[in-house]
Amino acid sequence: SPFEIEAGTVLMLEPEWARAGELRAQLLDESYPKPFVIDDGESRYLYFNVRLMQSQMSLKAPHDLALRYTQKMMGFLLFHPRPRRIVQIGLGGGSLVKFCYRRLPGVHITAVELDPDVIALREAFSVPPDDERLNILCADGAEFISTTEKGIDAVLLDAFDRNGYAPALASRDFFAQIYAKLSGSGVLVVNLAGDKETYAGVIGRIMEVFDDQVIVISVPDDGNHILYAFKERHFEPRWRWLNNHAKELRARLGLDFPAFVHKMERASKLNYAQREALRGR
C-alpha cells in the first residue's frame, strides 16, 4: 500500500501493463477515478479515495457485518422481521447484500449501483452471483425506484460517491417515490455520514414525507447516523415487546439487537431526529 495509514496490498481495476508509479501517484493525490481495494491479510477494504473507506470485509468471516453502521442498519428487522423483498441502493462492498442473502433465506434482494467499477469488484468481496433471490443492477437508484413495482418491505440506502452522500438521492421527490413503493409496513433505512448540515436536510425531508415517523440513532465509533423511517400509519413502537423480540433476533442473527432497541428508544424519547433536522433549516 502507498498509504501510511494502511498497510497491505492494493487491488485495482487496471491492466497488467499499467504503470505502477503513475497509479501510486494518482492514489496519493486523489486523482485516481476508480474505487480500489486494500487487503491487509485480515480484512479487505473498499475505498473511493484515501479519505473515504466505504466497506470492510473480514477474510475469516466474509459474510459477517464488520462495520458497526452496517450492523445497525439491520435494526429494521425489529419492526419487519420477515421481509420478502429488500432493495438496496448503493452496493459498496456488498456487506448488507451478503448478510441478507445468507441470513434471511426467504427474501429477494435487488441491489442498485450506479458505478460499474464498484460492481466489478463484487468477487473481491465474495458477493454471490445473481440468481432467483439476488439481482445486482447497474442503474440509477432514483430511476429504479420510480419504475419498480410497489411492495418493497425495506429500502436500504447507503449511497456514497467519492465526494460523500450522493446528492441525487437526497431530494424530497426521491423519498416520496420510496414511500409510495414501500409495503404498508415497509421501512426506509438510510446511512448518514459526513457533513451534519448536509444530512440534516435529508433528515428533514424524510420526516416531511413520512409524517415524522422517523428514528435516528448515532454510531459513535464510525461517526455515522442511521435513520429509520416507517410507512405504517400511526406507528407507535412497543418498546417492552421490542426488547423481548430483540433477544430472539440476537440469538437468530448474532447482532446486538437489544442494544439497538435501547438506542432507538432513547433517541425516540429525546426527539433526536427532530433536533438533528433543525440543523438543516
Residue ranges and their predicted role:
Residues 1-41, 54-60, 77, 227-281:
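SAM/dcSAM-binding transferase cores
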Residues 44-51:
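S-adenosyl-L-methionine
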Residues 51-55, 160-163, 188:
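A short, flexible beta-alpha/helix-coil linker loop
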Residues 173-236:
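C-terminal substrate-binding/active-site "lid" region of AdoMet-derived donor-dependent transferases
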